[in-house]
Amino acid sequence: MTEFFSGNRGEWSEPYALFKLLADGQLYLGDSQLNKLGIVMPILSILRQEKNYESSYILHNNSQNIIVTYNNEKFTVPISGFQEKAVLLLSEIKNASGNRAFSIPSIDDFLKKLGFTHLSASSSSKSDIHIVVHDLRTGITPTLGFSIKSQLGSPATLLNASKATNFTFKIYNLKDKQIEYINSLSGIKEKIKEIFSQDGKLEFVKVESCKFSNNLTLIDTKLPEILAEMILLYYSSKLNKIDDVTEHISRLNPLNYNLSCNHNYYEYKVKHFLNDVALGMRPDDVWLGQYDATGGYLVVKEDGELLCYHIYSKNSFEDYLYCNTKFDTPSSSRHDFGHIYQVNHDFFIKLNVQIRFL
């Protein structure tokens, strides 16, 4: 019995992106609102890692063929073939629903001919494909790694939640009976709002994980406090978009920065944080400030068009992350947070968030 490749909409978006790139022959840079900037980088070749070997796709001058090499195999495929398969893939992805896995038998032989061993890259890597481009502004031909983010599937996660991303807060001004009642409430946001409605106070104590705390401090010494303020605002209000939460915190200015000259302290630091998460920083690992081998993100838009965001255009990349992400509440039981607990005579609560794309 023949086994077909199977994946959800996000996983199928990876071969779609490859075929679309080979058909277009160039990368389009995008702005924060997912519009083309008018800056184009011609593609020279694309590299994709399979299980035991690397496949390369070379766009040769003005040829209408792509040179494909992998595992001692070398052959050409007409660009029109990638165009046709990209159209087919996009239609099948759009017709799928939910996050279920599905197969596309009509494209299976083409994938196997190209040496595909899987649809999507390993989750341990931040880069899904590597692209050699001709940067017309500098004249150089760098190899850039890209993570593919698809709007055709479920929203991707930028910062994954874990116990390492718990933030601990101390509770003041509440009596035992009040604590008991608040703990009986089911929703975490409901608990936080009730703490404040009963004149309670929450004070940030620490980031639960020493590694994550140090990673944040490496980015900016005040970043743990800034994120703690943002997390509190998220759980005590209807705000969830990163840019909205940051702007609100900026107006409150809880860290008492000197704003007399209109410096965007909070926005600058949050953008730096998002950039570093996107390019290598993981909460569970010691991070030394070195970016992963990635150039940035390739975004598959809902209409199938591709936009590129990379560290060569750092401002556009950070603006994209800032304007297209939001806080989300992860599983409290899995990550052990959202319950008031007592240590000696003091009460504490841990709060946790993950950051998703819109």
From Swiss-Prot:
Pfam families recorded: RE_HpaII (PF09561)
Catalytic reaction annotation: Endonucleolytic cleavage of DNA to give specific double-stranded fragments with terminal 5'-phosphates
InterPro entries on file: Restrct_endonuc_II_HpaII
Hydrolase as UniProt keyword: yes
Record GO terms (molecular function): type II site-specific deoxyribonuclease activity
GO biological process: DNA restriction-modification system
Keyword Membrane appears in the UniProt entry: no
Keywords: Endonuclease, Hydrolase, Nuclease, Restriction system
EC number: 3.1.21.4
Top-level taxon of origin: Bacteria
Oligomer status and interactors: Homodimer.
Name of this chain's protein: Type II restriction enzyme HpaII
Species the sequence originates in: Haemophilus parainfluenzae
The gene coding this protein: hpaIIR
